[in-house]
Amino acid sequence: MGAGQSTNTSGHGASPEEMSRILAHRFASKCFTPLELTHLKDNLYSLALKQGDIHYWNEEVLSRFLGIPDGDEKFGLGTLDAGPVIFRMVSYLGAFPFQNTLAPSVLTFDAMVKVIVLLTDRYGKVLRRGKKDRIKLLFGSLADIGRKEASPITSGDKSDNDQGRPETRSDEAGFSVDKPSNDADDYNDDDDLVLAALESLDAIEVFKHDQRIDRTVYEAHISFDTFQRLLMLFVVIAPLQSCEKTSEYFSQLNEESLKPARYCVENILTSFDIGDRTKGIDYETFYWVISTSLPYMFDPLTPLFEHLLFSKNLDLSRRKDSGTCSVSEEKQTKTESYFSPSHPPVILPGSFKPCILDSAVISHLSFFLSTSSPTPNLLQNGTRLHGVFSSDTHGESLTSFSHHVLTWDAPSILLVTGSNSHSSGDEADIITVGAYIPQPWKLPASTSTSHYDTSHQSQLPCLFQLSPRHAVMQGSPSINSLKSNLPVVSFSTKSGIAIGCKIPPPTRTSMDTSRPTPAGSGSLWINPALENAEFFMSNGLSHEEGVFLPPGIARWSPSHPPSKAESETIKISIYNIEVWGVVQTAPTPAQSPYHSRTSTANGDIPDAVARQQANWNFEAREAERRREIHLNVGGGDSEEQSGRALLEMAGIIGDSARRR
């Protein structure tokens, strides 16, 4: 009890600076291994500038170490000038949990410890109550309005004497975005990270005195220019691993290879746009779009800042007198040959040349698509993509589609690109939509029902639009209770390909022209000729049940609630269709549920690519066997007809064989 009372008294009487240092030390001891902490100290102190007894980093040092562009006009208009944006974020996060008083913080060792813990999601080891998302904290670090001038330490200064004296006075004004707007003694329930930090220090009273209720955050905005530069960085380095050199991702870029990245960024920005970009992005729009449509967009920050936990000066794998290269040299060699902007490493060798899928599209998909659990990001969880079908390579026919897609018994991603049927087909009118199908496509005559594990997002389907606007419709949690005429996927030679549509009842009339119709908040229909498609979205106010939830776009966000049901149907003249199989290369604890259809015929083949090839080999052997049987039927026409009739009755040829 004595220790508890002592801590309590210390917490109440300590200044924000002291409490901030205590939290940093607690983060350092709980969230890093001793080896990581040693590497971090070596990196920070070996490159640090010095002002008196204070060692710190400025923007130039931070950008150079992370390997990100800082004031680089190489690619024009500064769209890759992410250094100032990252430095702004870090200066804000380094003041956690006292952003009002201490931000922007000087990037000392204590500040950088907190930054790394927050940006790499390690705070759960200390802050048990903290939310898994950091959206509000990240918004505050990016907001442009009301910031005070940064510390006198500037990135443009060259000598220690000219760097300016770092100050950490608690009576200075911090970011005005964090200034309390009233004097109430309660606090914002959204600040769980801050509250958890202060509770761990027994310093709630300090928090109440320092911040109170923060309402101005809801009035602040992020400029589109700032957000564009950050998005460009994320699109380029999305595949980054902790052991890779960031500079390799930029050294291979040129103006031509950056065009897809810029196009991708513009499409994402459109989902935040409510008509006037000069006002920037407000908090409610930011929170709505990020949480519903871009939940993994900030994931590249984790490997980027984990670079600080590896020091080249302390590389224990070096062998001075060895004739073989070190582990780090092997990693570097692997990294340099592994990444190529023109052919992303996530695509497995042997796949067809993609017309839709490129590095920018893969990065875009990784911002929202969950393909595994507990690590959802497809670029961080070992996911590889295998080319299953391409209309450009395999032809525009449902026969070819069924041959390639229905024999794939693992999750898949469908991509469709084309032009708006009501436009002239200019580049601005190019439309790309798609869907994530977590279970195998079923045969047309299949009567089995699918069951989806709603506890994991990777087990739910997803419908999305990538261009000219980003929109995501996640699978409904009530998907298993939908009626049988609302399947996730329907495939038929008569009605085409339907995703999230309402399927009409079967009819005996050969002239029946009924086709799947839109349902719920989103659907995609492709006609049997694979020439046209219809992409449907609604704001969900019609309350019609369906496979997908409403899209998270700005114009239908809670901050701009529509007064009535709204929907949008885009008619697409198709250019290309691609289906990419999802292959998990990382070991998973549980056996994959996608083996049942081929396990009896081909044995328990663990790899989806091998299982598909085994299916094709089996079909080829059966075709050869049928051909030999047909050739062995001798005699005249009557005997040939009798033999054919026997084969049809046995189900080897004819309609019954096709339905098997």
From Swiss-Prot:
Record keywords: Cytoplasm
Highest taxon in the source lineage: Eukaryota
Major site of localization recorded for this protein: cytoplasm
Record has Cytoplasm as a keyword: yes
Pfam families: TLD
Signal sequence bounds: none
Region: Disordered, residue numbers: 150-187
Matching InterPro entries: TLDc_dom (IPR006571)
SMART domains found in the cross-reference section: TLDc
Protein localization: Cytoplasm
GO cellular component, one term: cytoplasm
Domain TLDc: 355-583
Positions with biased composition (Basic and acidic residues): 157-172
PROSITE patterns, per database record: TLDC
Reported function: May be involved in a process influencing telomere capping.
Family: Belongs to the RTC5 family.
Protein name: Restriction of telomere capping protein 5
Top-level taxonomy: Eukaryota, Fungi, Dikarya, Ascomycota, Pezizomycotina
